[in-house]
Amino acid sequence: MSVAKSIAAVLVALLPGALAQANTSYVDYNVEANPNLTPQSVATIDLSFPDCENGPLSKTLVCDTSARPHDRAAALVSMFTFEELVNNTGNTSPGVPRLGLPPYQVWSEALHGLDRANFTDEGEYSWATSFPMPILTMSALNRTLINQIATIIATQGRAFNNVGRYGLDVYAPNINAFRSAMWGRGQETPGEDAYCLASAYAYEYITGIQGGVDPEHLKLVATAKHYAGYDLENWDGHSRLGNDMNITQQELSEYYTPQFLVAARDAKVHSVMCSYNAVNGVPSCANSFFLQTLLRDTFGFVEDGYVSSDCDSAYNVWNPHEFAANITGAAADSIRAGTDIDCGTTYQYYFGEAFDEQEVTRAEIERGVIRLYSNLVRLGYFDGNGSVYRDLTWNDVVTTDAWNISYEAAVEGIVLLKNDGTLPLAKSVRSVALIGPWMNVTTQLQGNYFGPAPYLISPLNAFQNSDFDVNYAFGTNISSHSTDGFSEALSAAKKSDVIIFAGGIDNTLEAEAMDRMNITWPGNQLQLIDQLSQLGKPLIVLQMGGGQVDSSSLKSNKNVNSLIWGGYPGQSGGQALLDIITGKRAPAGRLVVTQYPAEYATQFPATDMSLRPHGNNPGQTYMWYTGTPVYEFGHGLFYTTFHASLPGTGKDKTSFNIQDLLTQPHPGFANVEQMPLLNFTVTITNTGKVASDYTAMLFANTTAGPAPYPNKWLVGFDRLASLEPHRSQTMTIPVTIDSVARTDEAGNRVLYPGKYELALNNERSVVLQFVLTGREAVIFKWPVEQQQISSA
């Protein structure tokens, strides 16, 4: 029997479910956006631990806690037969029964709470805390909050893992930048800014999940995804599984990968997921430039960090990309390029044939499996009850601290887009009309990638549990064109002091495998809002969902008194919205995306990856958009007023020689360009009557270096907690050397001599100018892209 046939027989015997279903249907993935994959679920395998006390491995090096993790993993893998080795190259690994090595599931989810866990029906381990979607959390501009959320998720994940109900590797965070306003998964990301926001989110989330910066004992393994150039699902029939994204070296370096550099170099992420799409003709999971030249040789990916394919993307290297001549070649191309573990069954089914045909070697396959098990060693998988996190239990899941932080994230992220003084509601308001498809929601609060929550508070729930008299009417559905519910809605509005409409978009319109074709309010929601606005009563609109919709008609309608963006606010979302509306809490979130006018979606194809304006493309993201947005990136109103001023010493340095900057000592920093160029320090005074948090975005702009020039770019952000009226507080935002560099056409980060400007927020409340002198200098060298591996 050949090696290939032997492996297939073993797989069918061990895993009669998912792994007995190889991809032989040959779906047309050029138009189908979902992989034909039925992965083994956590619920159907035994997630126990190896017995290093009395089991077959107890006397081997893998159970020796004094040995190096790599050596322990290598010793384990060296004991595998070839068939056993191949069996353990997929996300659903059967382990090695003869060695007492249990099955293992690589694929767990932790985007904003536990998902793909084996939840019980009731009682212990039946739920986990559900935080807001990342797009809303990032809008809070609070680094500490991101880290707290990730830390809690990791704690709860380890508690579930200790009873065999969750894995130790999580497919999170999603750090792709939200470039296209129509992208269905933009809700999962930290917004449209790659260099500053996505990178900061990556750092805080990864270090929270993993328990620090490359700790000796990993808490969980985070997976930075999707690497790289992935930001469409199925736009106009262009499937994510077959998209070939044409990206210049300049924008690949400037926009599509800097967050992955931070994830690898600074946060020391231990796993990276290669994406479905191809870039410049090469599928990401078969792209040695991405996975070796950039990730490992340039970005400094940890030595035993492993690359996981997105689910079935190794198969997609053949179908639909046709980069490889057949599925066996796709498996060989992917492993040789640096994709260590296959989320799917392609490796498990086709490595035998690839080995027989001498397209792969045992050493190439071992490399990936050793990397996976090195991380499991670092996670304490082989350490028995002595594992650092083995004492976490259900009691560590049931904590009001986690619930409070979920609520806090929702409150801090909510953005006040428009307000004429109607909010916060006056004390005299007694009755409210609650209308719209988002008013009485449950799991819709959670967005996507979620598990059961301990509770879900809808806006209707929250108001019903307050002192208001509530008149509720559904009104209309998200995408409905029926007006059958209008009369009931108008009736409820007429007998109320204030009208609140909650609508927008949801996961029926934006989701994984689903992009929008427009950025307008769907259905007849605007028609109903317009009729409500004619009743002569205060009207508040809650615009919900991850992506933005064109709310220009609401912005210009004087009878729409207030407009709030609430994202997907999680388990306490309704309470958070109530508390903002009533003034118990004050809004301070800022948009981390641009709200474009509706015609933007029709001007150029979403598959155009170029950010810089050209042809019919008016430019993408706040950095390059040449049109007039409905609401700018960074927009957000307060219930109070603030005054920002420089301390005024007049002694701060405003001229810097480039060569002096780059030759100075840099203790505490791995690279000199990570050092602060200057500290932007301002005094913030609450000049109004309401206590409020204050949020700031610091932008840079220049005409130094070659044209075209971006409008501006984000170099820092911060949040001050609860500033009382007439009180002042100092805020300092470090501006690093790297943050004022620009990217040349070859992808290099360059410091150019010339005049620069730093401006606080969109309103430019404080402006600081400085000059760089000397000679231009490359501070980050983008490696020359070479020919990729030849297809097998």
From Swiss-Prot:
Domain of life: Eukaryota
Pfam families reported for this sequence: Fn3-like, Glyco_hydro_3, Glyco_hydro_3_C
GO cellular component: extracellular region
EC nos: 3.2.1.37
GO annotation terms (biological process): arabinan catabolic process; xylan catabolic process
Biological role stated in the UniProt entry: Xylan 1,4-beta-xylosidase involved in the hydrolysis of xylan, a major structural heterogeneous polysaccharide found in plant biomass representing the second most abundant polysaccharide in the biosphere, after cellulose.
Residues of the signal peptide: 1-20
Keyword Nucleotidyltransferase: no
Subcellular location, record wording: Secreted
GO molecular function: alpha-L-arabinofuranosidase activity; xylan 1,4-beta-xylosidase activity
Similarity field: Belongs to the glycosyl hydrolase 3 family.
Natural source organism: Aspergillus fumigatus (strain CBS 144.89 / FGSC A1163 / CEA10)
Entry keyword set: Carbohydrate metabolism, Glycoprotein, Glycosidase, Hydrolase, Polysaccharide degradation, Secreted, Signal, Xylan degradation
Sites carrying sugar chains: 23, 87, 118, 142, 246, 326, 385, 404, 440, 477, 518, 679, 701
Matching Gene3D superfamilies: Glycoside hydrolase family 3 C-terminal domain, Glycoside hydrolase, family 3, N-terminal domain, Immunoglobulins
Pathways involved: Glycan degradation; xylan degradation
Protein name (record): Probable exo-1,4-beta-xylosidase xlnD
Main subcellular location of this protein, as a coarse class: secreted
Catalysed reaction, written as an equation: Hydrolysis of (1->4)-beta-D-xylans, to remove successive D-xylose residues from the non-reducing termini
Residues annotated as catalytic: 310
